Amino acid sequence: MPLPDFRLIRLLPLAALVLTACSVTTPKGPGKSPDSPQWRQHQQDVRNLNQYQTHGAFAYISDQQKVYARFFWQQTGQDRYRLLLTNPLGSTELELNAQPGNVQLVDNKGQRYTADDAEEMIGKLTGMPIPLNSLRQWILGLPGDATDYKLDDQYRLSEITYSQNGKNWKVVYGGYDTKTHPAMPANMELTDGGQRIKLKMDNWIVK
């Protein structure tokens, strides 16, 4: 099936990515050791989550395109998740449903696509090389396969450096939502050369 000329409506102002919630804490002071028991406990608490969902603002910025959207991310089980991107008017631009061995994506024209790899599909259909497979861990504040990372003074991720498939991603966490337990990321930015991905999570629901 030919790939569509798929581009999200780019109307969401970048200012919407500014954090305003008083419950967000930002890293202060020197970071902690990745070998600390507090960090191991935090990772275990996050991994123990069976279901979670979050929504907020998304921005992808490169020399070729600038995309702004609202997003909704829901995980309902191991390797089962749903990603929804909407424009500022609330219309769906992209809906992705993934489960083991099957990924389905519906674009803003109602066209349905199937594949085995969500990251590859999103890249081909949107032109945005989003590291979705790693982002599923990073958005939770977990390093995933990355071994080069730093912690903040509260034993949470503050920075990740990760190289794969010719990409050199740097992830910086700007704050955490302390209304949830465990505390979850509230603001993060991914960069690779001239590409930037910004995520601002409005809230989390975890189980």
From Swiss-Prot:
It is found in: Cell outer membrane. GO terms for biological process: lipoprotein localization to outer membrane; protein transport. PROSITE patterns: PROKAR_LIPOPROTEIN. A lipid is attached at residue 22 (N-palmitoyl cysteine). GO terms for cellular component: cell outer membrane. It is a lipid-anchor. The keyword Membrane applies. Keywords: Cell outer membrane, Chaperone, Lipoprotein, Membrane, Palmitate, Protein transport, Signal, Transport. SUPFAM superfamilies: Prokaryotic lipoproteins and lipoprotein localization factors. Residues 1-21 form the signal peptide. It comes from the Bacteria. Pfam families: LolB. Monomer. Belongs to the LolB family. Plays a critical role in the incorporation of lipoproteins in the outer membrane after they are released by the LolA protein. This is Outer-membrane lipoprotein LolB. It comes from Shigella boydii serotype 18 (strain CDC 3083-94 / BS512).
